[in-house]
Structure formats: structure tokens, C-alpha cells
Amino acid sequence: MIQQQTYLNVADNSGARKLMCLRVLGTGNCTYGGIGDQIIAVVKDALPNMPIKKSDVVRAVIVRTKQPLRRASGMSIRFDDNAAVIINAEGNPRGTRVFGPVARELRDKNFTKIVSLAPEVL
């Protein structure tokens, strides 16, 4: 569960390393975000000489959470870290690679480009 002020790792090669969540996008007063939800975040740590700089406000989609995700089959899945992929206004990733596993639920939320770039889909 991701809320305001939560720090996330960046799971792509866009140049950012750490994000801090400013707002969870959704319907109404959406307090918490889970896998597949879009967030507005600020870049807290970035690599030098890359297009995304520190203190940039970006849009991202959550791909991993430490909070267990309950599936309809009864299985629950949990990751080791909270991570997000930076996206543009159309919902496509800004980077060209995605690092680490991502959840299958991203395909249901129409983030097929992120799923196809990921090395492992759980």
C-alpha cells in the first residue's frame, strides 16, 4: 500500500533512482495505491547526465509492493521492495528497460508495454 510521502525504488533505466509519492491518482479521495495504480511523485535521487533530474515531478505506475497482494485464486504475492516505473502522459514507460519482476495484474490494467519489457512476470 502506497500513500503520500512513501519512498519507492525506480524499476527502469530512465535515470531516477528514488521517488517520493505525492498523490495517488484514482477516483475520489484515493488514500492508498496498490500494484497497477498511477501516482504523481517527485524524484529524490537521480543519476547524473540523464533526462530525468532530481526534484522533477513525474507520473509513475506501481509495479511492486511489500504489502501482500491477494489474488482471486486465493494465492497471495509479496515483493521485497516498493517499486514504480516512470511513465509519460500516454502511459508508456519513459525508460527502455524494466528491472526486476512485475505483477501479472499490470496486464489487466493495460500496461502491456511494461509487462513486455519486464524480465519476469509473477
UniProtKB/Swiss-Prot annotation:
Keyword NAD belongs to the record: no
Record keyword RNA-binding present: yes
GO molecular function: large ribosomal subunit rRNA binding; structural constituent of ribosome
GO biological process: translation
Disulfide bond positions: none
GO CC field: cytosolic large ribosomal subunit
SUPFAM superfamilies: Ribosomal protein L14 (SSF50193)
Keywords, comma-separated and alphabetical: Ribonucleoprotein, Ribosomal protein, RNA-binding, rRNA-binding
InterPro entries: Ribosomal_uL14, Ribosomal_uL14_bac-type, Ribosomal_uL14_CS, Ribosomal_uL14_sf
Function of the protein: Binds to 23S rRNA. Forms part of two intersubunit bridges in the 70S ribosome.
Quaternary data: Part of the 50S ribosomal subunit. Forms a cluster with proteins L3 and L19. In the 70S ribosome, L14 and L19 interact and together make contacts with the 16S rRNA in bridges B5 and B8. Can interact with ribosomal silencing factor RsfS, which may inhibit ribosomal subunit association.
Similarity remark: Belongs to the universal ribosomal protein uL14 family.
Protein name stated in the entry: Large ribosomal subunit protein uL14
